[in-house]
């Protein structure tokens, strides 16, 4: 239902417009308060790059964060990542992720970033506390914030916005009548707009998410998509599950059933086991897999995806970050 409302296919958004106007007014006043110095802004002692979006729901921020971290690491930079840690409940904050940290403590996306990149990751509702926790453990050259565009309490040196190229901004209204956290005009003040899928518009950078090999949650065995010839069951607890199901179909994997869960869903073993009564393969996203490894069955698989950007555009982004680091004394 909410997808129909936000996409503009249902007139029910009209009932939510008063709440949207209130949301928009509060968001505008809040941003102005930070810009005018009425509320204190904390600046990190090193360059900070924000990766965020203007809409609610999954747009591909985390794959871009992973791409940035990996590319910067290859160039010899010491990179840290901070996040709100949505979906996790730690006993205390800030929490710096370690080898035994669970997704229920830190959230699924921070754990995925840490596992994929090996970078130091910290979570806290107050992002400045997360940055300080990272710096207390080891020197860094740059910090990347996963989903912090609207966290104006934290000063930033570079803003990257990811948008879904298929859904764009839906009906264009603020939450809850539409998907917008801020109006589309905010794009005029960011450093780069990265479009995940669809057709990029002038000045936007296209990004594709690619993956062809599935990994077994228990054994780590890898299989190319073409090896799945019998119908499988697919599940996804991400911002936009249909994208994952469409990806599997494009890879030629026959789907017997699909199950969409809420983003950051906390899973129970018996619920997922019931999805495959004939012991069919159960396919999921890598983000879901980090929450299911502890109780995974033998025939559960996940599809890792990686972000790809045009070489020239990607090099420009990395060069701008390198320039920020070069202007900062190295610790």
From Swiss-Prot:
Species in which this protein is naturally found: Edwardsiella ictaluri (strain 93-146)
Gene Ontology terms: cellular component: plasma membrane
EC numbers on record: 2.7.1.130
SUPFAM superfamilies to which the protein is assigned, alphabetical: P-loop containing nucleoside triphosphate hydrolases (SSF52540)
Pathway: Glycolipid biosynthesis; lipid IV(A) biosynthesis; lipid IV(A) from (3R)-3-hydroxytetradecanoyl-[acyl-carrier-protein] and UDP-N-acetyl-alpha-D-glucosamine: step 6/6
Protein family according to the UniProt entry: Belongs to the LpxK family.
Alphabetical keyword list: ATP-binding, Kinase, Lipid A biosynthesis, Lipid biosynthesis, Lipid metabolism, Nucleotide-binding, Transferase
InterPro entries listed in its UniProt record: LpxK, P-loop_NTPase
Catalytic function, reaction form: a lipid A disaccharide + ATP = a lipid IVA + ADP + H(+)
Binding-site residues for ATP, renumbered to this chain: 55-62
Lineage per the UniProt record: Bacteria, Pseudomonadati, Pseudomonadota, Gammaproteobacteria, Enterobacterales
Purpose: Transfers the gamma-phosphate of ATP to the 4'-position of a tetraacyldisaccharide 1-phosphate intermediate (termed DS-1-P) to form tetraacyldisaccharide 1,4'-bis-phosphate (lipid IVA).
Protein name per its UniProtKB record: Tetraacyldisaccharide 4'-kinase
Example GO BP: lipopolysaccharide core region biosynthetic process
Keyword Aminoacyl-tRNA synthetase: no
Source species, domain of life: Bacteria
NCBIfam families on file: lpxK
GO molecular function: ATP binding; tetraacyldisaccharide 4'-kinase activity
Pfam families, A to Z: LpxK (PF02606)
Gene this protein is translated from: lpxK
Matches recorded under PANTHER family: TETRAACYLDISACCHARIDE 4'-KINASE, TETRAACYLDISACCHARIDE 4'-KINASE, MITOCHONDRIAL-RELATED
